[in-house]
Regions:
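A contiguous strand-loop segment
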Residues: 25-152, 172-305, 309-313
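Glycine-rich, aromatic-lined ligand/substrate-binding cores of catalytic
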Residues: 247-381, 385
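Histidine-centered catalytic/metal-binding microenvironments
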Residues: 446-537
């Protein structure tokens, strides 16, 4: 690759590092033995108030294509006609170019691209660390001036373009970071391909590690690095940057004698409920016998990196965890002043007091479900929905499909667009907050039955596609998957358009069908009212 513009990257890196730090995401990587149907999963809730809303299909590029390496190529960018039209937005900078050495894979492109036509899927969680602690200051000094040319957006794009398996993606991304360097905050990238699930953590400079998720286990991360063990000479299960220990010793990050723990060495993270409490509720949902303590400081350092679930999981199970706001615990965000009289879990103020997995600022949620028993064209399934998980839906997308409905490529946050998929859900989300306790029942009535049917339908459609592919009718199979996916996406768009009308009619001004008498406030609100302002219902 050409490095003529790398000097520019370093000059501007300090300004750009903060851009990715906006994100605040929760991810799961699920081994095939931990799921009911033997699929692997890689998930991502893209939680931010500034992320791009749109999703595109990036077509395969033939061998010999000139490919740009772009830093921060998301804000205001337009990939609708990429690569014929290269619009990298207001911040995007081309720092390098290379020539493709293979026909690249088609993939689903978003703020963080997530699925290709081979069934390789990934997500990410930006990792914070304590920059003011003694270890944090050493980390800052160690990585200062070592900014490279790859950020997380570009690394995921290029891996999906060029890799077919999770292991290949780990090796490919690791080689790029080793040679060309990292530019951005530390990241935790979860990856799966139907056979294996991996976690790839990159900390800065040329330093990274990757661990395979045991087949019977699940990994979860919430904005902090979590690979808390180190294994040498086992590349089938653990890989890392060359000279990683030497780098740690030379920069005073490790004494060379104690246990070498990558996440605490390169991304030191003190007890902070913002992240640890999300991980706690997720892991306890998967295995209640873990007996993890969400309050005692520093015990989270000993939390398991991987959890074997008490019961094998489904997509619905993971979706339910994404909708969690600490119900049934002392941290329930609806049982606070921010929950209001109707138990609203989506008040923006709650993120600063009790950060839940379910968040008002979730741009989109994706749950990749990849089953290696199916042909590539049929296995590359990802479940997608815009907005807060508790009120959104999931619709099936395939990395192999040949088109997307128009509403996927529309929408910006500042301008209401009734034809945008994100805005379509955002209206429902906002209206549900008027009287959440009642409105969520309307959401469930419109959504849950359809999703149950859809899970079964999609599995059946995949089997039909597999049969067609087995008969040599691959184009026919892909056309069927495309038509089915687009039909479901349009169905959900119409359903939520109608649901918005229902919510507005039912709960305008907090009433129920225009009736303000007999409104049911939460017990918390009634008790608060009685103690602070006198009983008022």
């Amino acid at each position: 690759m050409k490095k003529a513009t790398k000097v520019l990257a370093i000059a501007l890196a300090i300004m750009l590092v903060a851009v990715q730090g906006i994100a605040a995401c929760t991810v799961f990587a699920v081994g095939k033995g931990a799921t009911v149907d033997g699929s692997t999963m890689a998930t991502h809730s893209c939680d931010s108030t500034s992320d791009d809303l749109r999703v595109w299909l990036i077509p395969s590029m033939p061998e010999g294509t000139e490919r740009d390496v772009v830093l921060d190529g998301r804000a205001g960018a337009d990939y609708s006609n990429f690569p014929e039209v290269k619009d990298y937005g207001k911040n995007g900078m081309v720092l390098d170019t290379y020539t493709t050495t293979r026909d690249t894979n088609q993939y689903l492109h978003a703020m963080y691209s997530f699925m290709n036509e081979k069934g390789l899927a990934m997500g990410e969680s930006t990792c914070s660390y304590d920059r003011n602690s003694e270890q944090g200051k050493k980390v800052r000094a160690a990585f200062d001036g070592k900014e490279g040319i790859y950020d997380c957006y570009m690394l995921q794009d290029i891996a999906l373009e060029n890799c077919d398996t999770a292991r290949e993606a780990v090796e490919f991304m690791g080689a790029l970071v080793t040679e060309y360097g990292w530019n951005g905050a530390a990241e935790c990238i979860d990856i799966c391909d139907g056979n294996e699930a991996w976690v790839f953590e990159v900390y800065g400079g040329n330093i990274w590690v990757a661990a395979r998720v045991p087949d019977d286990s699940i990994f979860v991360a919430a904005n902090r690095a979590r690979i808390n063990f180190f294994v040498e000479n086992d590349p089938d299960n653990y890989q890392y940057a060359p000279g990683i220990k030497e780098f740690a010793i030379e920069n005073g990050l490790w004494d060379g004698q104690s246990d070498f723990i990558p996440c605490f060495t390169f991304a030191p993270y003190p007890y902070r409920p913002y992240s640890t409490r999300r991980e706690w509720v997720a892991m306890m949902s998967l295995d209640p016998t873990l007996n993890l303590d969400p309050e005692e400081k520093d015990t989270d350092r000993n939390w398991p990196c991987f959890v074997k679930p008490q019961n094998k999981v489904t997509v619905q199970d993971i979706f339910n965890i994404y909708g969690n706001y600490y119900q049934g615990t002392e941290y329930d965000v609806t049982k606070s002043i921010w929950g209001g009289q109707f138990g609203d879990p989506l008040n923006p103020a709650q993120d600063f007091t009790q950060r839940a997995i379910n968040s008002y600022r979730c741009t989109y949620l994706q749950i990749a479900q990849v089953n290696a028993s199916l042909p590539e064209e049929a296995r590359c399934l990802v479940w997608f929905g815009w907005g807060a998980p508790s009120v959104t839906y999931l619709t099936p997308l395939f990395g192999s499909q040949t088109s997307l409905p128009e509403h996927f490529g529309r929408g910006v946050r500042a301008d209401y667009d009734r034809e945008s998929g994100w805005w379509n859900e955002a209206v429902v989300q906002q209206l549900s907050r008027i009287n959440y306790t009642a409105a969520i029942e309307d959401v469930k009535a419109a959504r849950d039955g359809k999703m149950t049917v859809q899970f079964a339908q999609t599995a059946a459609i995949q089997e039909v596609a597999a049969s067609l592919i087995g008969m040599g009718k691959t184009e026919e199979a892909v056309a069927m998957l495309t038509n089915y996916s687009n039909m479901q996406s349009k169905m959900w768009f119409n359903t939520y358009e109608e649901l918005a009308d229902t919510l507005l009619s039912n709960y305008m001004q907090g009433s129920v069908k225009g009736n303000t008498w007999g409104l049911k406030y939460t017990d918390f609100w009634n008790e608060l009212s009685a103690s602070e302002w006198g009983q008022y219902k």
